[in-house]
Amino acid sequence: MSQVFNFSAGPAMIFPEVLQKAQNELINWLNQGVSVMEVSHRGKYFMELVTQAEKDLREVYNIPDNYRTLFLQGGARGQFATIPMNLIGKKGKALYLNSGHWSATAAKEARNFAEIDEITIVENGEQTRITDLDFSHIADQYDYVHYCPNETISGVEIFDVPNVGNAVLVADMSSNILSRQIDISKFGVIYAGAQKNLGPAGITLVIIRDDLIGNARKETPSIWNYATQRDADSMINTPPTFAWYLCSLVFKHLKEIGGLEIIEKRNALKAQTLYDYIDSSKLYRNVVAKENRSTMNVTFITGNPELDAKFVAESTAAGLQALKGHKVLGGMRASIYNAMSQNGVEALISFMKKFETENLPQ
């Protein structure tokens, strides 16, 4: 079978080295004669895995000692409700910065639990761009300020951290977590579904500052209560052990290849290579301002929906999978998360050049 490159927005590709290791020990994990999927989540070997996974994650992401890591379920959508249930306090309201589909969806869910103010920070003119990120003059009115630093659908990324003064900043990093080095101390809570850069779907990572745990409203279900999950080591219920195991392999692999310093350089090169070609092309166009172009999700169009559909069909046949844009926006989208290689990007560009030659209007 010829090589296939998977540009899916999520669940996304996982490092081949990680998948190979998982395959090698699938039915005989740690020479126990059983799969990791078959052992007790509270047994000696799995608890050692959990401890090592957290240690590796903390090292790779440089997580401060006064932050806890929780491995939960429910995806980012679950956190859309969990955040207000745990963080709304005396001020009784939160501020949501709307940069696109997912930040708007988070705000809509949060309104079921609290008073939510929403400010649009994206301009959709000839080019899509992020506006002012200084909210220090109003942030202290709110229990927290929420934003999504990478919008997968539109391919918009916010590289600067919003200025919220001393307010609690909450970030949905589902699509750019572990893609570059960040200062975690600037955030109160970071959360992310696993299925883009952490591992397979099923695990939701929450990184939360210690002082923000223990303030949940009394009717919060125990499974969504950060304090309960902290005290139970994220095991108030039986966790998705295989997903946790694969995440542990990803963290270890990131360490082995040099950490986020290396990953950040690789990601920047992949994205720049693809954007440079799109900008030089006479057929394709990206509508996001250069300073806000996503490193993870590269969107592009031909300007002709029928030609877009033809591109998707022919690229799929050529072994370039999942390039169809989100139904909300259309066009094409190449998701080039951590596990995507430079070779994959070069293969995509090679196909794009061929398609342009064959389909550019005369």
Swiss-Prot record:
Cofactor(s) in the UniProt record: pyridoxal 5'-phosphate
Stored Pfam families: Aminotran_5
Pathway: Amino-acid biosynthesis; L-serine biosynthesis; L-serine from 3-phospho-D-glycerate: step 2/3; Cofactor biosynthesis; pyridoxine 5'-phosphate biosynthesis; pyridoxine 5'-phosphate from D-erythrose 4-phosphate: step 3/5
GO (cellular component) term, any one: cytoplasm
Residues holding pyridoxal 5'-phosphate: A76, R77, W102, T152, D172, Q195, N237, T238
Superkingdom assignment: Bacteria
Keyword Ubl conjugation applies: no
Keywords tagged on the record: Amino-acid biosynthesis, Aminotransferase, Cytoplasm, Pyridoxal phosphate, Pyridoxine biosynthesis, Serine biosynthesis, Transferase
Entry's Gene Ontology molecular function annotations: O-phospho-L-serine:2-oxoglutarate aminotransferase activity; pyridoxal phosphate binding
Binding positions for L-glutamate per the UniProt entry: R42
E.C. number: 2.6.1.52
Localization, UniProt: Cytoplasm
Modified residues (N6-(pyridoxal phosphate)lysine): K196
Cofactor note: Binds 1 pyridoxal phosphate per subunit.
The protein's enzyme class: transferase
GO-annotated biological processes: L-serine biosynthetic process; pyridoxine biosynthetic process
Catalysis: reaction(s): O-phospho-L-serine + 2-oxoglutarate = 3-phosphooxypyruvate + L-glutamate; 4-(phosphooxy)-L-threonine + 2-oxoglutarate = (R)-3-hydroxy-2-oxo-4-phosphooxybutanoate + L-glutamate
InterPro entries, per database record: Aminotrans_V_dom, Aminotrans_V_PyrdxlP_BS, Pser_aminoTfrase, PyrdxlP-dep_Trfase, PyrdxlP-dep_Trfase_major, PyrdxlP-dep_Trfase_small
Function: Catalyzes the reversible conversion of 3-phosphohydroxypyruvate to phosphoserine and of 3-hydroxy-2-oxo-4-phosphonooxybutanoate to phosphohydroxythreonine.
NCBIfam families: PRK05355.1, serC_1
Quaternary state and interactors: Homodimer.
PANTHER family the UniProt entry points to: PHOSPHOSERINE AMINOTRANSFERASE
Family according to the record: Belongs to the class-V pyridoxal-phosphate-dependent aminotransferase family. SerC subfamily.
Name of this chain's protein: Phosphoserine aminotransferase
Organism this protein belongs to: Haemophilus influenzae (strain ATCC 51907 / DSM 11121 / KW20 / Rd)
